[in-house]
Curated annotation (Swiss-Prot):
The lineage of its organism: Bacteria, Pseudomonadati, Pseudomonadota, Gammaproteobacteria, Enterobacterales. Coiled coil: none annotated. It holds the Pfam family YfbU. HAMAP family: UPF0304. InterPro entries: UPF0304_YfbU (IPR005587), YfbU_alpha-helical_sf (IPR023146), YfbU_helix-hairpin_sf (IPR023145). This is UPF0304 protein YfbU. Belongs to the UPF0304 family. The gene is yfbU.
Amino acid sequence: MEMTNAQRLILSNQYKMMTMLDPTNAERYRRLQTIIERGYGLQMRELDREFGELTEETCRTIIDIMEMYHALHVSWTNLKDTQAIDERRVTFLGFDAATEARYLGYVRFMVNIEGRYTHFDAGTHGFNAQTPMWEKYQRMLNVWHACPRQYHLSANEINQIINA
């Protein structure tokens, strides 16, 4: 992340204020303030992750994934025989915190801040699937989009989607 000295000074002052406003996270803010003030390039890359960007297309894809899981769960609930498919298979897991942190952050934002998909169970890991999921979700979306009745899926269609 490239910043002018003026930008670094402003950000440093922001971190200084945050240490006073949020004492529980003061150490974290002091550390970030030091990194910014001294211009430690390697550690400043952490800010790239914090201030990263998701394109509109990526955000829409994540919402589409969440909507697919909503449709899967609704369809599963409407099945006469729900025993044939384990409910965990139609439960949204989230994304991997280690490799898909930006996607995970967006999911948490959508649920916790925007109040969408609040019926999703965050589990004990807060939607951290602990394994990369993006490619799997892409395959699932392709199958789901090909279904004629996306919110009234049969057991066979549900199985095709979750096994994609």
